[in-house]
């Protein structure tokens, strides 16, 4: 626990991405769980930190003024910058570029469309949402081809695996795992990492 760095969140994929990044980077933090069903994310005090009323939000009180980050992917970059070499190769070169390329594949081609499908479902546009969901599953299936090494971007766990893990978790019951042996092997390996277990435990529903 570290009160200098606080992470506000809930049991969501976005929060999990941020928490895993901090855990993998070895950055001590204090989790601050918000009950979304009780609409704690709309409390006036929290809205001063995150006017959109969403999670996660990271506060680094070690900076003057305190640094506030509201985007999970920005928190991943924050963690990578504070702990060079932990979430991506520290030195410029092909290995680092591959990590960034795979990371953004999951952010832009998989996670972003899945969010669009979620909002379409909420708006009652189920047919349109289903089309996008199928596209997400196709892209996750395509990721099988990435796994020529242990992880999504090589032999080292990286930010690419963080973005991949949370979205694969969300779609795990809709994937044909028998057709995805490498993705299945990768998922089991990543899910068993202590950082994943700690990040999940930090924001489980209470």
Regions found by a protein language model. Give the residues of each.
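Residue-level recognition of oxygen-bearing side chains
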Residues: 74, 182, 195
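GST-like fold's C-terminal all-alpha helical module
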Residues: 79, 105-192
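GST-like domain detector, emphasizing the conserved glutathione-binding G-site
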Residues: 1-130
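Short, solvent-exposed turn/loop segments enriched in Gly/Ser/Thr/Pro and often Arg
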Residues: 35, 159, 203-204
């Amino acid at each position: 626990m570290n009160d200098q760095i606080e992470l506000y969140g809930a049991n969501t994929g976005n929060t999990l991405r941020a928490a895993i990044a901090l855990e993998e980077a070895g950055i001590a933090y204090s989790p601050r769980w918000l009950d979304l069903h009780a609409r704690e994310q709309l409390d006036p005090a929290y809205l001063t930190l995150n006017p959109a009323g969403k999670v996660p939000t990271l506060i680094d009180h070690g900076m003057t003024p305190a640094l506030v980050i509201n985007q999970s992917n920005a928190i991943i970059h924050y963690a990578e910058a504070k702990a060079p070499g932990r979430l991506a190769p520290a030195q410029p070169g092909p290995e680092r570029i591959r990590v960034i390329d795979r990371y953004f594949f999951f952010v832009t081609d998989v996670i972003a469309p899945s969010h669009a499908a979620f909002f379409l479902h909420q708006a009652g546009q189920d047919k349109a949402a289903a089309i996008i969901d199928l596209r997400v599953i196709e892209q996750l299936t395509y990721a099988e081809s990435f796994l020529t090494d242990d992880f999504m971007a090589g032999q080292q766990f990286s930010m690419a695996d963080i973005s991949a893990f949370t979205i694969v978790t969300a779609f795990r019951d809709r994937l044909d795992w028998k057709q995805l042996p490498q993705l299945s092997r990768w998922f089991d390996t990543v899910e068993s990492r202590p950082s994943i277990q700690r990040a999940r435990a930090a924001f489980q529903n209470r």
